[in-house]
Amino acid sequence: MPCAQRSWLANLSVVAQLLNFGALCYGRQPQPGPVRFPDRRQEHFIKGLPEYHVVGPVRVDASGHFLSYGLHYPITSSRRKRDLDGSEDWVYYRISHEEKDLFFNLTVNQGFLSNSYIMEKRYGNLSHVKMMASSAPLCHLSGTVLQQGTRVGTAALSACHGLTGFFQLPHGDFFIEPVKKHPLVEGGYHPHIVYRRQKVPETKEPTCGLKDSVNISQKQELWREKWERHNLPSRSLSRRSISKERWVETLVVADTKMIEYHGSENVESYILTIMNMVTGLFHNPSIGNAIHIVVVRLILLEEEEQGLKIVHHAEKTLSSFCKWQKSINPKSDLNPVHHDVAVLLTRKDICAGFNRPCETLGLSHLSGMCQPHRSCNINEDSGLPLAFTIAHELGHSFGIQHDGKENDCEPVGRHPYIMSRQLQYDPTPLTWSKCSEEYITRFLDRGWGFCLDDIPKKKGLKSKVIAPGVIYDVHHQCQLQYGPNATFCQEVENVCQTLWCSVKGFCRSKLDAAADGTQCGEKKWCMAGKCITVGKKPESIPGGWGRWSPWSHCSRTCGAGVQSAERLCNNPEPKFGGKYCTGERKRYRLCNVHPCRSEAPTFRQMQCSEFDTVPYKNELYHWFPIFNPAHPCELYCRPIDGQFSEKMLDAVIDGTPCFEGGNSRNVCINGICKMVGCDYEIDSNATEDRCGVCLGDGSSCQTVRKMFKQKEGSGYVDIGLIPKGARDIRVMEIEGAGNFLAIRSEDPEKYYLNGGFIIQWNGNYKLAGTVFQYDRKGDLEKLMATGPTNESVWIQLLFQVTNPGIKYEYTIQKDGLDNDVEQQMYFWQYGHWTECSVTCGTGIRRQTAHCIKKGRGMVKATFCDPETQPNGRQKKCHEKACPPRWWAGEWEACSATCGPHGEKKRTVLCIQTMVSDEQALPPTDCQHLLKPKTLLSCNRDILCPSDWTVGNWSECSVSCGGGVRIRSVTCAKNHDEPCDVTRKPNSRALCGLQQCPSSRRVLKPNKGTISNGKNPPTLKPVPPPTSRPRMLTTPTGPESMSTSTPAISSPSPTTASKEGDLGGKQWQDSSTQPELSSRYLISTGSTSQPILTSQSLSIQPSEENVSSSDTGPTSEGGLVATTTSGSGLSSSRNPITWPVTPFYNTLTKGPEMEIHSGSGEEREQPEDKDESNPVIWTKIRVPGNDAPVESTEMPLAPPLTPDLSRESWWPPFSTVMEGLLPSQRPTTSETGTPRVEGMVTEKPANTLLPLGGDHQPEPSGKTANRNHLKLPNNMNQTKSSEPVLTEEDATSLITEGFLLNASNYKQLTNGHGSAHWIVGNWSECSTTCGLGAYWRRVECSTQMDSDCAAIQRPDPAKRCHLRPCAGWKVGNWSKCSRNCSGGFKIREIQCVDSRDHRNLRPFHCQFLAGIPPPLSMSCNPEPCEAWQVEPWSQCSRSCGGGVQERGVFCPGGLCDWTKRPTSTMSCNEHLCCHWATGNWDLCSTSCGGGFQKRTVQCVPSEGNKTEDQDQCLCDHKPRPPEFKKCNQQACKKSADLLCTKDKLSASFCQTLKAMKKCSVPTVRAECCFSCPQTHITHTQRQRRQRLLQKSKEL
């Protein structure tokens, strides 16, 4: 299928369409050839279609540009809320179908699935059921389809696994589905099948099983009205016709045959795809109502369901299904899974009225919507057309009758509708008829769609797996088991273990437990036979934002850095499931936007250089950045001398430009590329106008558009100059050609693109301060750059073929415009000194000027005049002395390019920076640092190539004048590697370059015979020389003969008009090419002239030797042309036209040449300056003449009309590498005697050339030189007034370089003429590739160069440009991927110029012999050995995480390093704990045996957290004692020891005693009287009291 231009996508200009043509066609269609169908069932179906198309859909953006071959719509997050006002995500696809593009504009069908959608798998009954809140992806789409040249159609597609669904176009309905089981290729298309709806193979037209009868339809309505009155008596109906949205909550059931056919894992996706299509059909405006089909529940019958019988008999199946679906439908419409209609999908071949297969596709109750026992239908699965069947049967549920039966909607012209009884497969799209609209509107207006008014509610289910008891309460479970009259037995307890139901007053049970989720009490439900409490969560607290933090430091000192401020969600923090704060968390602004110095390193380069001091794989490198377009805000760096790159940072520092070069101001912030406007505001839409003025209106801009029309040229030709400051540069060819665009600077020797005859790759090239995008699609080239350029550049064209035209344009600011900004309001002012540039040694502090606004402060630098910005200041700063460090020099070249002994060295010194110098120190001063390596192995993984062997040189092909010698060159294969082709010796060489002797300067003529026209001539190829002069000759003959010159002219030379007749065919000169109008006239003055007739000349090569005539002025090797005449051959005195086809040349077009005979009129002819057309000489022989006469190759100019048919007087001439010879035209004279005349040459003198009557005016603006042509002195002349060609004329012709082959030239004079230069043949190019030279012999005709000094000497040499000397450059092999058991290693292969080592495009190497060097090779094939391990050592620590070690070694060094056993293992990871003891308490008694107590705890050791104390175990050490004895001595009996008074106050001691603190030893000691010792007897206490009483009395 052709790739058509999508001009209908947007209002693109022709230029923009050309630029984007390649992108729009990318990934357009599958490759030609048959498509395999791995799935047999699909193959059988497709092969049965009369017509189908294989397409390759691609995902595109809104503009139609290619994005991906991946078609899946990637919404992986949890399903969003589907409110009607929510935002929608759009997705776009493009398909090339029937030579036109289809552009799909789709969005997720938000209302297609209910928010409480449930997928349920049933295994026979309710006790074996699995319910899940399905996680079906949001891949079901709906929208529009746009076809080129037509209006918009509708589409409903599912992008879950490819594109499946249907779309409507004005000329028909189409289905699309992917080729199943087709292998998915990364980066490749997935083939899809598109077929028309009417092309679905069916033996007969399928029908609907609903019977068409007036009586039946009337009875259905009466039954419905009766049911409405009986079941809904209190509902008042509004008789107004109000259009409002309706939601049809739908249950879809798939039987076991559906699951078996589509597979358990695919059936859900297939059904949802079908229902998505059904939704699209009900959204067709022809239905006249807003109806939404919403799937709330999908039931997959994994096993045959009890109570549901699906048979061939459609009515019985429908009756069984309706009864069954009512039993499982929750009664309350508020239940999230309550359905309004049930749809059964089956693979059973159903038939209306019979229990056998037939053509019935579906059956439904008429007007059954919202009736629980009749709102149901059955549908036979027939593939994607199933969607139309379901829509048809749902229409019956809305009371829609068949079209054409008892109504006026009979399909006109067999144009069907959705509600046609027989689903005829007509190409036009299916819609709802006017009758269908009236039926459904009447149904809804009567209030029969009352159940469709509620919007599907979202149910608060938290778990993905839903317990059945949540949906079915205990009463419903009993009804499912024992019928609709059963209820739950309230008297029975422990419902979670056994469900008891009341049936006819008796409690019965099947000893089954109630379903999980059944309510078993307040805030409790059944789970796994147990009643579990459902906890209530506290009220949630939503979060609130706190205050903004101050602005951070600027990330850069110049070039637009970034500052940030952030706020936290802590006012208050969200708790108990409360929503987190929404809105802006962190804000950014740009700072220090003034540009950095041009010589300063880029910001990315500075970040890469930070890793110069960080060892990478134990080596230090100097890193520089590389750009990854796919991840512009990640930092990738590459060593300067390395061939690998590494991602150093996941996110560059804020303020790093996203793209280096160009005019993009976008910067990376927090790892994301942010758009920055020209006003340096983040996410700003401020842009520059066409000439760079921020927020400008373009009034200061001018766009220059030019066209380069030069058709022909050689080498590099200037197209035009792009001035400095140019923007929006576009250069493009009008049509594809074989030419190449090039760019060079104003320096002629400096090329930026495609210079030196080297064609570069497509891509972006940084030059002149901007980036030029060079793109070549086929032969069409274009250049684009945003600008501005910082220097003027020349656009050139490297000519290869005719230029069809090149147009280019650019935008530049007008000259002489004043700046509207008031300059006096803004001025430059120096800022603060920066910190020292170094942390040690001597550095620099800088001070820069900032743009200041008067009365405001520092503003952006763009407000100040950059021309007046003062230079920055700097001064030295001295810091502490720098410490010693290692300095490593550059690596020397490797000692070997291959083999096992390669090494490279470098110098490593210990140095210290002292001011501006480096001082070398002893190595011991740096011994604390890691010393870089001084010796490194290299090229050891590269096998050395085999050696070339050469043979002896052959003899030279010629002895002089330039020849070739050859020799054999073979590869010895003395190594495993092949020979290096880049070092292959030459097998050919030039030889015999010495000049040939003068006696052989004239070559021997070719041999030839003349035939009488029976055999066509075989033309000898004549190589076209680089310089193609014109040469004019006339036949020469013996001196005694009166000669005449045959005329070669345009047809009808006697008329002066531009029209003529060629053998009965009309011709007309083209006035649009004036360069074709000039002619040459060569004639003699004889009155009796032999004429070349149209039937007389034929040329036939022969192997006979030809010698020159004794009577003619010829010599060996001379070239003579003859004219003969004989009896029986007619002749004419009128000039005869000889049309000639020019030699093929794409550069110039030469003039027409005429040679007239007879006494014709004098004709002037304008001189033609063009010398590019070739003139070929031929050699002929006249039969019937004893003296063999040689002929000369005659130079011929192109005819007036370049393409003459075979019916013309003369056949066309060969154009490519062939001599220009007319065929099968014998030439004779009246006398039969050959006439030989001298050579005629053209001299650019001031003498005039006669002009014929049919002269074509010469181009305007040119003054032609008139050439006076004379015959040589040795020729007989007549008394004609026409001039003759002189010897001087012939010399002039040779001098001007018009002679094609001087060696074939026979000197016309007898030695009395003037001297002239004679040139030899051009040699072959001196080289087989690259720049070389052609050589030829140049000598004076007198053999004395001084005689020809007055004449300009022709060039003896000229340059020749052949293809570049291309060769394959191979990089170093990488390390082997495995060290044993077979790995691989890779290397880089590049096509390079073997002379200057520049990279070439790969096609330059396609002519090299042999295949390219391999990119990869196997390595280390030896089998891996087993690792040897030693026993584990003891743990290094007894607690707190120790390490065990063991020896792991490989005996032979050939073990798999990826499977190396661990040599270390953690051990004793428990916490280190110890027993901690407190201080001993006081002894419980002062005598008589007491005890002391202290605290003993197991606590973590030092360094562990105190909260880890619960995890401590101290069993490994004995527990310290917690008690000990004290004061074991016996108490003394002395009365002095008796306590008679408390040491503290009596009242305080009584208080302590009341608080029961007497047991405390310190309290007992201070209050000894109030708290006596326990061992004091009663008598002692009495005696103590008496003593105390006495003391008081005293």
From Swiss-Prot:
Disulfide bonds: 322-376, 351-358, 370-451, 409-435, 478-501, 489-507, 496-526, 520-531, 554-591, 558-596, 569-581
Record propeptide residues: 26-240
Biased composition (Pro residues): 1018-1027
Keyword Phosphoprotein carried by entry: no
Cofactor binding mode and count: Binds 1 zinc ion per subunit.
Residues the entry annotates as binding Zn(2+): 208, 392, 396, 402
Domain TSP type-1: 542-597, 823-883, 887-943, 944-997, 1313-1366, 1368-1422, 1423-1471, 1472-1532
Protein's name according to its UniProt entry: A disintegrin and metalloproteinase with thrombospondin motifs 12
The organism of origin for this protein: Homo sapiens
